[in-house]
Regions:
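A residue-level marker of the well-folded mature domains of exported/periplasmic proteins
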Residues: 1-175
Length: 175
């Protein structure tokens, strides 16, 4: 089970825990890691164990083709949640994910609406290579490249950790 990264994540995990219970006829197995290779290995082990479903919130968007193909070949339903994976749509049953690119676009539009003379941005990202990191970053980078008064002064990952994000901001303020 992942740590509480957001209210959305907390709610969806709570819902999964309420639905996928022994009382409802499920034997739930969970695995959490921010490392894609560890997630891939765990998913492959779950396939070997003969699970009926894989519910995946991927650390990274890539590297999942072979595992999801294996799941499909073994009749295992795959559901993506929270984050998208860059694979053929036929390899998963459904995706209940956020539109990360739209979130990035909305953030950029909000910043533009401030009508500042200069934008000196501390860009704190999630796990590198994740759908959230890529989708939210691309609109910002496009705007920075298009406007002379937009500058990213620091761009670092906090890997979904609020304390790390605060440390990054404090170090920029104190420098």
């Amino acid at each position: 089970i992942p740590p509480s990264e957001s209210g959305y994540r907390e709610a969806i995990v709570k819902d999964f825990e309420a639905v996928f219970t022994a009382e409802n006829g499920y034997e739930a197995k969970t695995f959490y890691s921010l490392k894609n290779d560890e997630q891939l290995a765990a998913a492959q082990q779950f396939i070997t164990d003969g699970v009926d479903y894989l519910l995946i919130s991927a650390a990274e968007t890539t590297g999942w083709d072979a595992v999801l193909q294996s799941a499909q070949e073994n009749g295992i339903g795959v559901f993506l949640f929270d984050r998208m994976i860059a694979v053929d749509e036929s390899l998963y049953t459904a995706a209940v994910v956020s539109d990360m690119a739209n979130q990035g676009k909305l953030a950029v539009e909000w910043l533009k609406g401030l009508n500042l003379e200069a934008y000196n941005i501390i860009h704190i990202q999630g796990a590198m290579g994740s759908d959230a990191q890529i989708g939210r970053t691309d609109p910002l980078v496009a705007q920075v490249n298009a406007a002379d008064n937009w500058k990213i002064v620091v761009q670092q990952t906090a890997t979904w950790d609020e304390a790390t994000a605060k440390q990054i901001v404090e170090s920029v303020i104190n420098s």
